[in-house]
Amino acid sequence: MSRRCTEVKRKSLPSNKYQSISAATSNQIMLASKLINKLTHHGNKELVEKMLDKIIQHIKHKYKADGFEVLESACNNVKPSLQVESLRIGGATYQVPSPVNELRSYTLAIKWIINSAANRTFEKSMWQKIAEELYEASNGRGGAVKKKDDNHKMAEANQAFSHLITKRRSRGN
């Protein structure tokens, strides 16, 4: 048994810039701040906030849709309900499906959107790639939605091992 104290989960503070927008809901602001924090490299948060402004304006002008609503619907279309965990039992490794916490599902959705946007080759800059991927994900298309579907197919294929995760949790390992 570990002698360390349990880690306190820190809340990511929403960006001050988007709290003043009355049209955005608290869930949309939370998703925008998660996207900003995931894209930030070497502490350049202001640069990423400007990039998010470009993304929202691009969606607004090209598709005549609210950028925050597109972000929310894209994350809701991409977030997984099941994940596959590797579990080693008796020398064999099993892929065991387990349910996903809501905060983790949003984190995975944002990560998958960013990764599939980075793999796009049609657009030139990253903000254009993310804007297009967000719009496609909000319509149920794109690489991030495909990643979610692949994840769910893997979980369904390994449904026979789902009883192992309950045994593992009841033992306390």
UniProtKB/Swiss-Prot annotation:
Keywords: Ribonucleoprotein, Ribosomal protein, RNA-binding, rRNA-binding, tRNA-binding. GO terms for cellular component: small ribosomal subunit. The keyword Ribosomal protein applies. Pfam families: Ribosomal_S7. GO terms for biological process: translation. The keyword NADP does not apply. InterPro entries: Ribosomal_uS7, Ribosomal_uS7_bac/org-type, Ribosomal_uS7_dom, Ribosomal_uS7_dom_sf. Part of the 30S ribosomal subunit. Contacts proteins S9 and S11. One of the primary rRNA binding proteins, it binds directly to 16S rRNA where it nucleates assembly of the head domain of the 30S subunit. Is located at the subunit interface close to the decoding center, probably blocks exit of the E-site tRNA. PANTHER family: RIBOSOMAL PROTEIN S7. Belongs to the universal ribosomal protein uS7 family. This is Small ribosomal subunit protein uS7. The lineage of its organism: Bacteria, Pseudomonadati, Pseudomonadota, Alphaproteobacteria, Rickettsiales. The gene is rpsG.
